[in-house]
């Protein structure tokens, strides 16, 4: 189980990303449309003034049951370890153990 402070930090980043998403997207569109370099620098300054944790690249996918940041499966939202345990206990419908 991940430390609770790390999980809370990640939730805070998600909230910030959602809050500033439209501002960031519109500023990036403006930069591509504006021809003059000085105006591009002004718009870029606006982007830099946004909180660092509001950038989507700062987000990290975590397992929703344990909070583990590594080996996550997007389809399930689980880490590999938790996914394996749940498949063995038949808690995930449609998932089967591989055998060859």
From Swiss-Prot:
Keywords: Chloroplast, Plastid, Ribonucleoprotein, Ribosomal protein, RNA-binding, rRNA-binding. Its main location: plastid. One of its GO terms (molecular function) is rRNA binding. Coiled coil: none annotated. InterPro entries: Ribosomal_uS14, Ribosomal_uS14_bac/plastid, Ribosomal_uS14_CS. NCBIfam families: PRK08881.1. This is Small ribosomal subunit protein uS14c.
């Amino acid at each position: 189980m991940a430390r609770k402070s790390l999980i809370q930090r990640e939730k805070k980043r998600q909230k910030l990303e959602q809050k500033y998403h439209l501002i960031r997207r519109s500023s990036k569109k403006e930069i591509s449309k504006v021809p003059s370099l000085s105006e591009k620098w002004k718009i870029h300054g606006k982007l830099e003034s946004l909180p660092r944790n509001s950038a989507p690249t700062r987000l990290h996918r975590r397992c929703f049951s344990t909070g583990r940041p590594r080996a996550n499966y997007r389809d399930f939202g689980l880490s590999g370890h938790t996914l394996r345990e749940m498949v063995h206990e038949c808690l995930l419908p449609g998932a089967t153990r591989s055998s060859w």
